[in-house]
Swiss-Prot record:
One of its GO terms (cellular component) is cytosol. The gene is lutA2. This is Lactate utilization protein A 2. Is involved in L-lactate degradation and allows cells to grow with lactate as the sole carbon source. It holds the Pfam family CCG. One of its GO terms (molecular function) is oxidoreductase activity. InterPro entries: Cys_rich_dom, LutA. Belongs to the LutA/YkgE family.
Amino acid sequence: MKVSLFITCLSDVFFPEVGKSVVEIMNQCGVELDFPEGQTCCGQPAYNSGYQEDAKLAAKQMIKAFEHSEYIVTPSGSCASMVHHYYKEMFKGDSEWYEKAVHLADRTYELTDFLVNVLGKNNWKSKLVEKAVFHQSCHMSRALGIKEEPLKLLSQVEGLDIKELPYCQDCCGFGGTFAVKMSSISETMVDEKIKHIEATEANLLIGADMGCLMNIGGRLRRKNKNIQVLHVAEVLAKGLSK
């Protein structure tokens, strides 16, 4: 099986360890992994800001970059949902690019979705002794319907005690450009999220979208909270049996 890694902007610039963890995970699974160098931003920031033509340019570049990929895996529910839902929306009036967008979406998977529903992983060999909570990101859980897959994988990590996070379905307040345009509302939302995390007495927050982790993690640091933040890929790669 051949898999192409769609790294995303946030992993490339802010969370390189997440990308490295995905590589370790795929190696453990015996998957042949490549990295198409022509990939770029998926176009979501431009699309959400109303710059349709700029978003289309980014989408076309992504479609070209992954044209020959068998499977495309990304450690981001947000970017995966952009490819799955909004590429087709952008190219509705262009039959050629619409078909290409559909073809790309059909081969694109969020990481935990791929591990559980394509590779059928049910006995993950990693270890991390921590008390943790899992944050359900909006795009991943609502747009893609991926809720149980990350929890199923995390339940297989030796030593990891996952506590139930109150109001886990609530947005953390990031929302891409929302956090910039409506910063005061965003701050209130992330403070509420932190309050619920603290109520569990967990010392580790796990998530599957780096935008959420950047937002919550940044707020935790600003408030001097001693709670570690990790992407699910980093957790799955911890103490991985070689």
